[in-house]
């Protein structure tokens, strides 16, 4: 049987026989394209049946390999979730977040293991574990409970997703079971899990023990290895609450005469400084002392029978001096409020000192240097309160010094004005509300009535503005609606007029007049005869 060579390769040649079949044969040296050759008895070729067999075998192998890979990947551990209460469990997950296995890390954890955990979702497994822990009494309603959850895995993004899912499911289950418990969720590295596994402890408990060692270096892993999570957390918090010995050193070093920080005025001092009343004995009468000294607690301890009361310059004084005090020398940079008693003889303050003095009867020499601000708390029988806004000097007179007047006429104040000194007309002076160095100072803090009036005025103004704006908006809206309605009505009328007239017709048909066909024929010119045709007709 002969065939023609169509294609050739290094090893094979393709020929076509008379029937049109393509046959593959071995190439020989005499084979040339387009030549006819004799076909051998044995021909190399693929039939349809053999091809189907090969394809089916390949497909079967592919299906088997894919199934085996899916089974292998399904059973391959991908991430781990540890649940620590006192029973410790480890949930092993695959890459699809399905539970492959649940292992108990201690004897109590074996009580919570069930066969139904396998092939279930993570949230279902966590829910079953917490429910069984509540049912078996590991989590109680009356006690403080703590659940430690640790997540470890190969993919950090997936670890964070599992962390959020586990925390939300745990809180949901605890709320459904009416159990109050603290849920602590942490993510760890796989190396830390292996370290905890070598020590025979849960990873979450290992983290808590390391935190306990930071607070208490004496703590050991073996000591807290078998203790529940709740107890470890409680010990950490108790140790943090106890103050250190280093924090007490500053308190022991403090001396009564040298406070570290200036203290604000007490409520009792404010009440006594505000009590200025009329004096019935006359304008030149002696100054009587204030007897309200029980509530005034001294910040600086002073000895009895001191002869002189001296304060160093640039000192702010806040102290209570008992009867018979004659000499008191506090250190500089302190605030002392002097309630001076009967037997004080010399009360001398240097420049730039701010004092609040309650002056007694027998004070003979009460001298204050320049640049001093003095606010004297005077009893009922006092009538004159010397105030020096120019910071020159201010003194309280005695019986022997009636004729000596060191105060200008501008600096005198009436007792009736002093009555209302704290009723809103003049706020009580406080160095902590000084606007020059306190950025949060507000002058209305001392006057709540003025603040209420201002808020009322603001509210009334705001309401008026709202009403005016609403009226303006309503008027504008009405005008706009009327204008739009007028425009719409005009447009509708115009459209109706256009429809009724012939202007809406086709403009090409307006001037066109229909004429009868006969008239068109009459107006048409006759067609001229073709040359030669009539002659032929006549001849015929």
Curated annotation (Swiss-Prot):
Query: Boundaries of each RsgI N-terminal anti-sigma domain copy?
Result: 1-48
Compositionally biased tracts (Basic and acidic residues): 238-256, 319-329, 338-351, 359-370, 398-419
Ranges of the Cytoplasmic topological domain? 1-50
Q: From which residue to which does any coiled coil extend?
A: 451-501
The record's InterPro entries line, in alphabetical order, gives: Anti-sigma_RsgI_N, RsgI_M
Where it sits in the cell: the answer is: Cell membrane
Membrane topology, from the record: Single-pass membrane protein
**Spans traversing the lipid bilayer:** 51-73
Record topological domains on the Extracellular side: 74-540
Location, primary (coarse class): membrane
Factors inducing expression: Up-regulated in pretreated yellow poplar (PYP)-grown cells.
The UniProt keywords, alphabetically, are: Cell membrane, Coiled coil, Membrane, Transmembrane, Transmembrane helix
Q: Where is this region: Disordered?
A: 238-429, 481-540
Entry superkingdom = Bacteria
Q: Which GO terms describe its cellular component?
A: plasma membrane
What is the role of this chain?
Anti-sigma factor for SigI7. Negatively regulates SigI7 activity through direct interaction.
Question: Oligomeric state and partners?
Answer: Interacts (via RsgI N-terminal anti-sigma domain) with SigI7.
Protein name, UniProt field: Anti-sigma-I factor RsgI7
Q: Which organism is it from?
A: Acetivibrio thermocellus (strain ATCC 27405 / DSM 1237 / JCM 9322 / NBRC 103400 / NCIMB 10682 / NRRL B-4536 / VPI 7372) (Clostridium thermocellum)
């Amino acid at each position: 049987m002969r065939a023609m060579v169509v294609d050739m390769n290094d090893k094979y040649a393709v020929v076509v026989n008379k029937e049109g079949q393509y046959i593959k044969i071995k190439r020989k040296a005499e084979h040339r394209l387009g030549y006819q050759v004799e076909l051998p008895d044995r021909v190399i070729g693929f039939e349809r049946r053999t091809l189907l067999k090969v394809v089916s075998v390949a497909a079967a192998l592919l299906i088997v390999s894919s199934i085996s890979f899916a089974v292998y990947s399904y059973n391959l551990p991908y991430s781990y979730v540890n649940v620590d209460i006192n029973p410790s469990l480890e949930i092993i997950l695959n890459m699809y977040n399905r539970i492959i296995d649940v292992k108990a890390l201690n004897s109590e954890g074996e009580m919570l293991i069930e066969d139904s955990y396998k092939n279930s979702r993570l949230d279902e497994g966590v829910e079953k574990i917490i429910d069984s822990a509540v049912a078996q009494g590991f989590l109680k309603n009356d006690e403080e409970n703590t659940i430690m959850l640790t997540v470890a895995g190969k993919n950090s993004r997936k670890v964070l997703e599992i962390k959020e899912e586990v925390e939300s499911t745990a809180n949901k289950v605890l709320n459904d079971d009416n159990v109050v418990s603290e849920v602590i969720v942490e993510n760890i590295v796989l190396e830390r899990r292996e370290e905890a596994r070598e020590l025979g402890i849960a990873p979450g408990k290992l983290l808590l023990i390391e935190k306990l060692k930071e607070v208490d270096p004496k703590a050991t892993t073996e000591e807290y290895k078998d203790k529940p999570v709740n107890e470890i957390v409680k010990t950490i918090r108790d140790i943090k609450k106890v103050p250190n010995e280093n924090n007490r050193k500053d308190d022991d070093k403090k001396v009564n005469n040298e406070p570290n920080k200036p203290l604000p005025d007490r409520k009792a001092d404010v009440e006594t400084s505000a009590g200025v009343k009329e004096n019935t004995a006359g304008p030149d009468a002696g100054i009587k002392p204030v007897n309200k000294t029980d509530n005034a607690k001294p910040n600086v301890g002073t000895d009895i029978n001191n002869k002189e009361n001296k304060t160093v310059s640039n000192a702010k004084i806040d102290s209570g001096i008992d009867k018979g005090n004659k000499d008191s020398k506090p250190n500089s940079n302190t605030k002392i409020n002097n309630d001076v008693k009967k037997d004080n003889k010399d009360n001398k303050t240097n420049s730039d000192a701010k004092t609040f003095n309650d002056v007694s009867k027998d004070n003979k020499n009460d001298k204050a240097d320049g640049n001093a601000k003095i606010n004297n708390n005077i009893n009922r029988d006092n009538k004159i309160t010397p105030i020096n806004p120019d910071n020159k000097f201010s003194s309280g007179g005695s019986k022997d010094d009636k004729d000596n007047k060191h105060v200008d006429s501008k600096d005198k104040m009436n007792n009736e004005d002093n009555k209302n000194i704290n009723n809103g007309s003049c706020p009580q002076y406080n160095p902590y509300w000084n606007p020059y160095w306190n950025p949060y100072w507000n002058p209305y803090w001392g006057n709540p009535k003025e603040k209420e009036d201002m808020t009322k005025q603001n509210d009334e103004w705001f309401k008026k503005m709202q009403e005016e704006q609403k009226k303006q908006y309503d008027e504008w809206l009405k005008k706009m609606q009327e204008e739009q309605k007028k425009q719409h009505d005009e447009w509708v009328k115009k459209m109706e007029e256009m429809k009724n007239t012939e202007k809406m017709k086709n403009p090409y048909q307006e001037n066109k007049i229909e004429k009868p066909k006969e008239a068109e024929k009459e107006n048409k010119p006759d067609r001229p005869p073709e040359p030669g045709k009539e002659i032929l007709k006549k001849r015929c």
